[in-house]
Amino acid sequence: MNKVYSLKYCPVTGGLIAVSELARRVIKKTCRRLTHILLAGIPAICLCYSQISQAGIVRSDIAYQIYRDFAENKGLFVPGANDIPVYDKDGKLVGRLGKAPMADFSSVSSNGVATLVSPQYIVSVKHNGGYRSVSFGNGKNTYSLVDRNNHPSIDFHAPRLNKLVTEVIPSAVTSEGTKANAYKYTERYTAFYRVGSGTQYTKDKDGNLVKVAGGYAFKTGGTTGVPLISDATIVSNPGQTYNPVNGPLPDYGAPGDSGSPLFAYDKQQKKWVIVAVLRAYAGINGATNWWNVIPTDYLNQVMQDDFDAPVDFVSGLGPLNWTYDKTSGTGTLSQGSKNWTMHGQKDNDLNAGKNLVFSGQNGAIILKDSVTQGAGYLEFKDSYTVSAESGKTWTGAGIITDKGTNVTWKVNGVAGDNLHKLGEGTLTINGTGVNPGGLKTGDGIVVLNQQADTAGNIQAFSSVNLASGRPTVVLGDARQVNPDNISWGYRGGKLDLNGNAVTFTRLQAADYGAVITNNAQQKSQLLLDLKAQDTNVSEPTIGNISPFGGTGTPGNLYSMILNSQTRFYILKSASYGNTLWGNSLNDPAQWEFVGMDKNKAVQTVKDRILAGRAKQPVIFHGQLTGNMDVAIPQVPGGRKVIFDGSVNLPEGTLSQDSGTLIFQGHPVIHASISGSAPVSLNQKDWENRQFTMKTLSLKDADFHLSRNASLNSDIKSDNSHITLGSDRAFVDKNDGTGNYVIPEEGTSVPDTVNDRSQYEGNITLNHNSALDIGSRFTGGIDAYDSAVSITSPDVLLTAPGAFAGSSLTVHDGGHLTALNGLFSDGHIQAGKNGKITLSGTPVKDTANQYAPAVYLTDGYDLTGDNAALEITRGAHASGDIHASAASTVTIGSDTPAELASAETAASAFAGSLLEGYNAAFNGAITGGRADVSMHNALWTLGGDSAIHSLTVRNSRISSEGDRTFRTLTVNKLDATGSDFVLRTDLKNADKINVTEKATGSDNSLNVSFMNNPAQGQALNIPLVTAPAGTSAEMFKAGTRVTGFSRVTPTLHVDTSGGNTKWILDGFKAEADKAAAAKADSFMNAGYKNFMTEVNNLNKRMGDLRDTNGDAGAWARIMSGAGSADGGYSDNYTHVQVGFDKKHELDGVDLFTGVTMTYTDSSADSHAFSGKTKSVGGGLYASALFESGAYIDLIGKYIHHDNDYTGNFASLGTKHYNTHSWYAGAETGYRYHLTEDTFIEPQAELVYGAVSGKTFRWKDGDMDLSMKNRDFSPLVGRTGVELGKTFSGKDWSVTARAGTSWQFDLLNNGETVLRDASGEKRIKGEKDSRMLFNVGMNAQIKDNMRFGLEFEKSAFGKYNVDNAVNANFRYMF
């Protein structure tokens, strides 16, 4: 296309001459054609002395791919990337691109010879006289040059394009122009990069050159040093390829690079700017490049010359009327008496069209004629409405809406023409009927709100293309444009569904910049019914068949002339044999004959390409985001659907019905070299992709989460197969080119942990679903009639898991860690190198705290060598373990975690099962091949067990359950500081048999007696059998609290018979005071409830004196808290309502009434915790004498519903009902010290009846019981109150304070405890306390009163810490 001026020595002139490249369109021409052009322009006398050569020369010790990626912003060279390392082919660091963020070269044309500096203008050198068009981005759109704008005196031009470029952002232009030495100032200009497409060479350190490719094959780029000369020309020496001053990626521009840009990073403006275009070089073996600096004044003038006078709309004068004469190419915009002349296309001269700029708020334009503006565009500085008279259209270079503007466009376009839209403002399409034109938008917002015509037809555009990553298109409704005609070009843009339901049958997305979103509050429904494929097939090339054999591309068309006839064949293999002898043309494995009709042969290839596309997977490179649900029905032909972009639907559901769905990362795109694919399955560098949605719904589907993909979503699976961490992957061999997707399927296994896929969420499996986990996993699994297989070493179950009729297998290096409990009605299996860890739940914001968790399964099968089961950090696991292979079982930890207090009922239950240990297991271990270790752990034998070795530290092994005795057989036992608890019925016992070796010390051997031996009964029951020579000190008799007793067995060691045996002789038992005290405290909870009600019996008296009316209704609420020894505390809320009637007798007011009460109380202590809900009712009578005396009588019945959990003697939770009766009498006398001050002595007596209760249960295998009989408390109280009344016109308030002594006259009920060691009786005691109270009673109106009282007590065994009583009374 172009040729840098080459300086050659001419013997005729005796000096250097500039040998020019008279460029033509030769991108695909041969060097011979280029040489011919050159020969025509060079004096013949000089040809024998000057070499015709062209090159872009780079270092040979750096991979050529680096230079290619640099030029196309691929690989590591993403715009904005910082401190990019550059390595040589041996992996040694050459240097870093650390002086500036990576430049964006998208403004450079696809062929590298020009750069976009304004939406409609490019810059290059004027000696590039042959090129007529340019393209940008992935090169899918071509822009024609309508005016070359050649500079009159320097080698520079700034061509104008026919349309506004929508794919890319123009490059910023230097603000310093040709200022002397401007670009030598390294404090401001910190880096210089270039890009070009000349013939490619590499150079070694000895200067040897190797040709890589011809001119214009592709672009390369690199660094250059600080200019040696900087004025109108920049001169530097990038040809000194290994000189560090030129940076780590020197790139010497040479013939073929004419017009290519030189960029500089302007640190002051914090952006890259184009400063110059390449003009000349110093020969292939030289080092110097010459660039012409951008003449900014000239450039600005060129652009300014293409504007007509600006149009300023004046409000109140009516719309701007736009008339246009197509013949003259001129038009007029008029408002009132003011006119503006505009220029449009004249004949075929697009450049005759000038740009128009509109200002004036809320402007209005009416097209009276169709306007053909050629290369002229419209720019709106303010908001406008543009409409047209019926059928009138507008065409031109495009529309720019400035930031903050909203232009309403009511004008339809022309078929075959696209409206190009730029600018940060909004363009609202609001025409009528069907607009046959298309839209290409590169910035801002376009709202499609086309209105229906009289026939109901709507089409805002025939097609929509979004590019550059900046634009948004908003759908007014679902009929605005055929979704299948929406495409996303280079870097894409956002399609906002705006709450509409939209169906795509194909997705045309060039890259990750393609976004489908919904920003509306109304949820959109997106249906991806991807049954259509691209039917545009390029004309296939026809290769020639070599008679001597060769290689080719299977599926391509080839020809050969035989007997003067051209025969056409389709190649079936990558290589073929000789066609002269052995004739490979007859081999169906190598060739398929498709006739001698060229057109039919070509059509056959096209048809097969289309047939292949019908089966090809669908790959979507873009993004789905926002408020929407996405549905993907089965794709015809069994085509798979692959997302290697991203999904972000936090409140949305993505559903797949049948077929295959794959979420995966995206291979990093690299620049192609000589036709190489931009991506491959075996490349190491992949981009991570994130997939987030509320729910992924799968039905009869096959789902894969593959490498470099993260999925954050719940999954609902119905008869589907889920593979997390799949090695299945797809690449698009046309990725980054904008061409039709060419998928390649294969496997790709990540090399690093960061490249592995990961999942977070909860999965529900139903109806024969299958889940294979090979990725990092965090979340929960509920499986019903399904199967789960784990091979990932990083699976974390953070939610409770449920497996019903479902299998769970961990194998091949898989590691399952469960943190929140698990249920399974089947066996969990650990295969070879599989590990299962059962743990408590980590407490948030703590370093080492865990809440207990329960694991209930039918069992665990350790079936493969090196299988492992770990129960640790607050986990309680139940279910037998069977080890059929050499495996390990770990219970507890030598570095145990701190167990947190329970916050949930499940956690509290789990904690109670641990019995103070760090971890617990309940079940048998069989198979004889497991190595078991215990640290601070509890093992409750659920059956006979056989293991290879057992290491026990600070742990306990006990046997419980039915009355069947257990035998633990172990080859090697190593126990220290541990407790072994065995049961006996005085005839048989649980046993421990050690067959090979027993070591250890400080172990306790405890016995749980299922029956109580008779006094003096001698036993002779072997408990432990170990090999001869085992130390007799390994086990000693231990004391164990069982029930309410401390039980110590009596043992002797027998070393006869070739074994060492520990034999049980009998036991000693004594009462355990702590356990008995806890039991007594639990049984006395009824007394505390009784006292709560007692303190509520007499709280009505302040309401009655001096009341008006014959009857009254009242309500009160009392809230309080109390405490006692043993960590006891309670709190209660008491609600009481009543109704009474007043009887006025001689000298006395008698009130008789009825009351209903409800009390909600809770209690907690070292021994128990629980709640009581009480309801009751009663009758009362109160007599108030005029003398000041009073008598109050009450009788009440209360029913108590109790729910308490005891933490002693394995009591557990008990739910029981009790009741109580109350009969109370109170009397007192109010002495008035003054008219408004009084003192009131009081006396009260309460007699009651509290029902007894009996509990029977087992602690281990020991029968226990607790009982207390009905008892009748008698409580007295004496005290005095002092009060004063404050009165106003319509109100009065009586304040009072008092103290009293409350005391028991009878002992509380007796508690009887019984266990295997006998019966223990705990007699009830008396209690007393001092009460203090302050309060007030207010008369609000004649018939309303309100009272408030505070109370507490001291000096008692049980005290009221605080109580608040509020009452309200209404008289009528």
From Swiss-Prot:
Keyword Protease present in the record's keywords: the answer is: yes
Provide any one GO MF term from the record.
Answer: serine-type endopeptidase activity
| Cited SMART domains | Autotransporter (SM00869)
Keywords for the protein's UniProt record, in alphabetical order: Cell outer membrane, Hydrolase, Membrane, Periplasm, Protease, Secreted, Serine protease, Signal, Transmembrane, Transmembrane beta strand, Virulence, Zymogen
Impact when changing S258I: No mucinase activity
Which parts of the sequence belong to the Peptidase S6 domain? 56-301
Q: How does activity depend on temperature?
A: Optimum temperature is 37 degrees Celsius.
Give any single GO term for biological process: proteolysis
Q: What class of enzyme is it?
A: hydrolase
The protein's job, in short, is: Involved in intestinal colonization, displays in vitro mucinolytic activity, serum resistance, and hemagglutination. Important to penetrate the intestinal mucus layer.
Please state what the protein is called.
Answer: Serine protease pic autotransporter
Q: What species is given as this protein's source? A: Escherichia coli O44:H18 (strain 042 / EAEC)
